[in-house]
Curated annotation (Swiss-Prot):
CDD domains: ASKHA_NBD_GLK (cd24008). The lineage of its organism: Bacteria, Pseudomonadati, Pseudomonadota, Gammaproteobacteria, Alteromonadales. The gene is glk. GO terms for cellular component: cytosol. Disulfide bonds: none annotated. Its EC number is 2.7.1.2. HAMAP family: Glucokinase (MF_00524). GO terms for biological process: glycolytic process. One of its GO terms (molecular function) is ATP binding. It catalyses: D-glucose + ATP = D-glucose 6-phosphate + ADP + H(+). This is Glucokinase. Its main location: cytoplasm.
Length: 330
């Protein structure tokens, strides 16, 4: 794209996590091009990696509109990355890189904004229910933490309502939930959903079940299984407690997702994002996830109508940042 002075105008998007930063160029149709992934640890500052990308792609003299999705609060000029030593001023970053515009959004705002663009190949439906056009959408994502966001459509534009829903109080539903809650409460003053629906949360469920079942782990390493190891052994059927832990994780995720649906009237669907659940889609399909999602007493008939999906698109952050930027600069 060119402006009136024949300067190339580009839209730059980024998805910045604690380990990697992904940068790309997008167009008005939200196509993502020139995707590059860099290790955050290889650069002393965010400006260095963005400058490197622009130089590498011959874009230093372009008019750049940038939208950066970042895993930390973005409502002040001064930004401190949660899991990185990077600190910067939004105003100074824009000036240093000579950007035409700079917009920072939360990482889950980006994921939420990607949802209306997803095709059937970029998501997997769990259970029944049909999405209603332009109705509210909810998304949650177990990963390092538990991200939550909501989308509403106003005058044919999607707007994201962020929040910290993952930190709401955990509410046990069945007897095993209660036992896990009681066991974890011996060391915690308060238990949020994030402390169960995350990588760390799955590990906590497993460790609680080892004690509840009065079983000694076969060795010290077995008692410190990672979330990935727990899910892998559960799927393989080689560890009964791992299976029990993953099954309970799926149930609790169903309860939490169902709560989101009722709270926000998410008749456009509830979407599951994050790096954990896509590892065991078939396991989730065969679990009690959907039963827990629908079982809401007198309101069960509402959740029975609401579809649930797992996002399988590999770059939802970049796609959502592109959608956000194109809505700002149509």
């Amino acid at each position: 794209m060119k402006n009136s002075q024949d300067t190339q105008v580009i839209n730059l998007v980024a998805d910045i996590g604690g380990t990697n930063i992904r940068l790309a160029i997008t167009d008005k149709d939200n196509n993502i091009n020139e995707i590059k992934t860099y290790q955050c640890k290889d650069f002393p500052h965010l400006s260095n990696v963005i400058y490197h990308y622009l130089k590498e792609n011959g874009l230093l003299n372009s008019q750049v509109n940038a939208c950066l999705a970042i895993a930390c609060p973005v409502d002040t000029d001064s930004i401190s990355m949660t899991n990185l030593p990077w600190k910067f001023s939004q105003k100074q970053l824009k000036e240093e890189l000579k950007l035409h515009s700079l917009t920072l959004i939360n990482d889950y705002t980006a994921i939420a904004m990607a949802i209306p663009l997803l095709s059937d190949k970029q998501k997997v439906k769990i259970g029944h229910g049909e999405a209603e056009n332009k109705q509210p959408i909810a998304v949650c994502g177990p990963g390092t933490g538990l991200g939550v966001a909501n989308l509403v459509n106003i005058n044919n534009h999607w707007y994201c309502l962020g929040g910290e829903g993952g930190h709401t109080d955990f509410a046990p539903v069945d007897e095993l939930d209660v036992k896990i809650f009681q066991q974890l409460k011996t060391t915690k003053k308060r238990l949020s959903y994030e402390q169960l629906l995350s990588g760390y949360g799955l590990e906590q469920i497993y460790q609680a079940l080892v004690i509840i079942n009065n079983q000694e782990a076969t060795n010290a390493e077995q008692s410190k299984l990672s979330a990935k190891e727990i899910s892998t052994q559960a799927i393989a059927g080689t560890c009964p407690i791992c299976q029990q832990a993953l099954s309970q994780f799926c149930k609790i995720l169903g309860s939490f997702s169902g709560n989101l649906a009722l709270t926000t009237g998410s008749f456009g669907g509830v979407y599951i994002a994050g790096g954990i659940v896509p590892r065991f889609i078939d396991y989730l399909k065969n679990s009690e996830f959907r039963a827990r999602f629908e079982t809401k007493g007198r309101m069960s008939h509402l959740n029975e109508q609401i579809p649930t999906y797992i996002i399988t698109e590999s770059q939802p952050g970049l796609l959502g940042a592109a959608a956000y930027l194109n809505q700002v600069f149509p």
